Amino acid sequence: MDRRRAFGIVLVLVSACGFGSGGLFAHPVYEAGVGWQVLSAWRFGFGALLAWIWLLASAERRRGLGLVDRRTAVVAVALGVLYVGNSGTYYAGLETVPVGLAALIVYVYPAVVAVMTLRFGRRLDGRRPWFALGLALAGVVLALGGVPTGAMPPLSGVALIVASPLIYSVWIVLSARLSGEKRDAVGGERAEGTDAAAATALMMTGTAAVYWLSALFLGLPVTPDRIPGAAWPGLVGVGVVATFIAIQAFYAGVRRIGAAQAALVSTIEPAWTIALAALLFGQTLAPIQLAGGALIIIGVIIAQAPPEAFSSIRPGVRMADE
């Protein structure tokens, strides 16, 4: 393995662990009495600020921003607004759903995306996406079924967590169009599109604006003087590690190893979250829930693996990468 590829894998691992740490950082924030809306406002506030600093610090990235036309900029900001639906449902659900269980449920999104691309995305033929989605959903059923009756989270919290990957899947398909992906492109091919750093800064700005405006409109305690000191480490962590670093590391890793391989490497994310949730907060999963998690990850691997990986099983089936 060459050095560039190895570094790309490391970057994607860093990204997966960063994204997977979001719920872990949120836990002490909630315990300090800060709600999910305020957490999200600061999360994307920090993320957007750092994204713009990163963008403007490089002449090459500044040139990329200059090439973004008005329509593309509006679309990027609109995608940021749409991202509120995904992030909001997830972090609202985390107020009542254990972090490890939430991580398992949310990770069905790659299988959902694989099915959505049959109609709305890249060229993706055959029944494999449906099989992958079926495995992932069976895993969710096992994960929920393993919760003791007396410890079952509120249905509203579970519904919010389930809604998150569905909204995120729509967001992924739409943002792929913004990046220049063609509907008839085979997985792994990428057209020229909007500069990643510019698109990220614009999208996070849109997300941050919605959270901050809504928090101020609702009179939530979002200003620094109204936030408990115990909440700040978690707020900074979720904004820096789980947002800015995670996103930038993922883009950098994809450039080195490709989106398909990045998607497979990212399957470490739920395992990372579950392990740390057990270590830090004592939130352990039952064996049947871990079996459900294994089904979800297998479904993701089937959905995202390149076609040649299964050519001996069913020739002629093409798979797209995430």
Predicted regions and their residues:
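Hydrophobic transmembrane alpha-helices of multi-pass small-molecule transport proteins
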Residues: 51, 116, 125-147, 276, ...
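Loop-to-transmembrane-helix transition segments
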Residues: 7-15, 62-89, 128-133, 156-164, ...
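Hydrophobic/aromatic residues within transmembrane alpha-helices
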Residues: 29, 39, 43, 77, ...
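Helix-helix packing/entry segments at the starts of transmembrane helices
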Residues: 16, 42, 102-108, 174-209, ...
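Specific alpha-helical transmembrane segments that line the substrate/conduction pathway
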Residues: 38-49, 83, 90-124, 163-164, ...
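Glycine-/small-residue-enriched transmembrane alpha-helix faces in small-molecule transporters
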Residues: 1-42, 81, 89, 132, ...
